[in-house]
Amino acid sequence: MKQPVKQSTAADSSISGSRVLKYQEGYTWQERVRRAYKDESGNWTGVTRTSLVGGSDEIPVPFHLRYFEVEAGGFSSLEKHEHQHIVVIMRGRGRVTLGDHETVIAFGDVVYIAPWEVHQFGNPDGPEPLGFLCAVPAERDRPVPVERKSSDS
């Protein structure tokens, strides 16, 4: 005999340790706070980060899932690191730099970033923010900043 399916609400979104983070207006999620892209200043501007799963919350998983938004004219730091990550574009259009190549990205595109690949996300043209989900290992190294190559050389 089939058991009836219990409908979960925002107030009751935990099921045996599993849970649903309800999406809210404006690319936000219940019980999650949008923060600055990084705690320290650097060569980036107009980027925010929302930790969805893993990190400082109570969900113990071997990966972290975050949502980033890059406002018009904004960009992430140009960096590299040992860990790989996967990005899924959820909103807007922008550009990703992977090594020496720059590619236009838009809703639905998936970006894989290999270990030690120099990379950067940007939204040079706007008008809508570039929003993306990013999955990384919970245990990972710190990014290494990379100096932009001079176009004069």
Question: Which residues make up each language-model segment?
Answer:
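A short hydrophobic beta-strand segment most commonly corresponding to one strand
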Residues: 67, 86, 112, 127-144
